[in-house]
Amino acid sequence: MSIVLDHVSKRFGAHVALDEVSLEVADSELFVLLGGSGSGKSTALRIIAGLTRPDEGRILLQGERVDHLPPQKRGVGFVFQNYSLFQHMTVGRNIEFGMRIHKVPHAERLRRREELLNLIGLEGMADRLPRRLSGGQQQRVAVARALAYQPAVLLMDEPFGALDVRTRSQLRRSLKEVQQKLKVTTILVTHDQEEAFELADRIGILERGHLVEVGPPASLYRRPKTELVARFLGEANLLVGEIRGGRLHVGESILTLPAEAPQVTGSLEVKVLIRPEELEVRPRGASIDGKGLGLGKILETLQAGPVLRMKVGVPSLRGTPILSPEPVFGQAEPTLIAHALPEIGELPVLVPGAPVQLAVRNLHVIPHEGGSLLVCIDGSELAGRSLDFAARVAAQMHGRMEILGVAEKPNEETRAREGLSAALQGYSSEFPSLKTRLRAGNAGDRILEELDRGVYDMVVLGCRGRHGPARSMGSTTGKVVMQSRVPILIVPEARRSLKKILICMASGVSGRSDVIFAGRLAGRAGAQATLLHVMEGDQPGLPGAAPDPRTTEYLRELTTERLARGILTLKLMGVPSEMKVRQGVAAAEILEEARSGDYDLIALGALEPPRSEDSDGRALIDVVLEHARRPVLIVPAPQEKGT
């Protein structure tokens, strides 16, 4: 293997950039590391080049360990996004720069320079200065300079990111030709999926410092092993189905089970991936090739060049969990996405509102995992309650648990270790892949660090922290609530089951992300849900003035409409639900409804997010935690992509 990364890790302060990444790249291979911002892809490249030192792990190039070697002795060529050409040097001297450092003879430098200029399509431009070249031409020179002294490995960090679309496409083709002719082992990092698919022999998907999956582009797209990759690459229809009796059941339909699907004797819940181009949409009554998925109605269309992109409502899938596309708050019926190259005669028929029939040409089955819970404990009584309830929730979600022990003081480590040991002994039979780890220091900081390095769907707080009672938003809970991107479950008192969930849509509290997340939890647990909205006593108006009846009536209508949309969302998920409206102080009314209705869980939406001690949202959460006699789920507001 030309390049080997062996359990490489890198941290920048509390941020984990790479977490035990292992990778092998074959001789002459063009390997693409694909990931979003902050995934760790550029860090991996810099570590291979010797520009950044890893905290742990080994780097091997051409079979030789190079961790200790400086960049200039690793035999690596590096191409940056911003060209990094010497502006005072001609194109020829830029290309020769590395060869001069390596003391290559003059005649050999000229021969190699002209060979590379011809290869990159810039013959005759050796005497030009970089400022007289276009961006695409400058990047070609940067590639030639990196290849000039014949490195064993070529590393490219978003090399086409600063170029326009047309130039990027041309350069991708040129790079592929050059790489294949020279047979130089190459790693390119990018966030551009089209670029990755066009160039790569294999792709590695990086997410939060984890190398999630590696494979040829077509295999990763059509047969991913994980939900994360299925959703990350392109668009996806991802539904929950069941293999039963050797057949695949999705909603009311029975679909053809792929040959590579697991063979089971009883039944097995799975995720069903249907790419938009594999979903056949035809006018009702027309002949159809795939396996029938039912009748539907076109909701939206968009002509993107020759491809017709459609959103299609499919009533027969009502109650079937659809993981992608994400449900929209208030959506009345299940929606799938389809891409088609329709025949000319079909174009006037495939329009919004048109009744259609759907069929599946090809699909892929992914093992179903119901979610990942991070349970944080400190060996206290609160930790025991939280762990017990978290285990029940994880079991009902068909998910997995990881347990983080936190010791804020050195004399607390023994208790934390004992708690972890007892947890491993008590729950490993139910969760065979159960992992535990111990962290010392501020509980809130350690929890947030673990959330940053792992991919979790929920965090369960079973540690008090040094300040604040277990029932209030003390330092640990407050810090995690304000900064966590995943829902937080706090267990002041445990319940024996999860059959009734109260989802609060009180004034000032987010009412979309919490409805969708709590609805998914209710669907997995087979629980009923109640949507609650609290009308505050004070209405908008002049100070001291009586409430305007027209304003009050308008707010009631708005509340009813909002609750009705929430009920539609829950019904779409197959969750039995009802709505209630109370009037008064939000926290008091939530607590009274929870008590009188004997709910097993209260779900609250955090503000966007609460960032100060005086935040109304934080005050409401604090009061509910102080007096609730049941678990409380706090769902953060969704963050903008890229944050």
Regions of interest found by a model, annotated:
Residues 461-479, 498, 601-627, 640-643:
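Glycine-rich, Arg-bearing micro-motifs that act as flexible, cationic patches
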